[in-house]
């Protein structure tokens, strides 16, 4: 299990690197679009659409790695206010709810992407793309998030009985 967790960590780091590169490319594209419009060269027509799709992909690429590192949005003031054992149980409850939600998104995302693929649906904006290209990353990202919730539960089971210390607390 430790080897799988280590391999998975490398995968998530690679995905976060890809998200950073995509963010850089999007920033350069937006800057170039503004520059071209200001000098009268007409801009980059699909820049808005590419920016929208990039933000979506950046989110899906970065989310599993951020969850693993404890850098996701987390309000843990209640966990710090209750007894250690109850905080630990609430951590479990949060992880179970997160796992179930992610698995539902995997199922739903895969269903929608498959339906789009078999129907031949097309997204027509500035660019014309098969719709499933935009939908396919969602179930993959949520499957990785579900796997991370599994690893989180494994780490929680073997840790001291108390809330995690992997987040910045308001207390």
Q: Where on the chain are the PLM-derived regions?
A:
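Alpha-helical transmembrane segments and membrane-interface helix-loop junctions
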Residues: 1-171
């Amino acid at each position: 299990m430790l080897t799988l967790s280590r391999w998975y960590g490398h995968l998530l780091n690679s995905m976060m690197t890809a998200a950073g590169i995509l963010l850089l490319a999007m920033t350069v594209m937006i800057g170039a679009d503004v520059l071209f419009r200001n000098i009268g060269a007409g801009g980059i027509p699909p820049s808005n659409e590419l920016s929208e799709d990039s933000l979506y992909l950046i989110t899906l690429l970065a989310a599993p790695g951020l969850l693993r590192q404890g850098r996701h949005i987390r309000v843990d003031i209640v966990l710090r206010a209750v007894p250690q054992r109850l905080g630990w149980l609430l951590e479990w409850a949060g992880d179970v709810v997160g796992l179930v939600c992610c698995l539902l998104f995997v199922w739903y995302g895969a269903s929608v992407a498959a339906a789009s693929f078999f129907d031949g649906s097309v997204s027509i904006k500035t660019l014309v793309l098969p719709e499933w290209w935009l939908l396919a990353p969602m179930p993959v990202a949520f499957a990785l998030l579900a796997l991370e919730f599994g690893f989180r539960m494994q780490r929680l089971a073997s840790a001291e009985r108390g809330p995690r210390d992997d987040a910045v607390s308001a207390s």
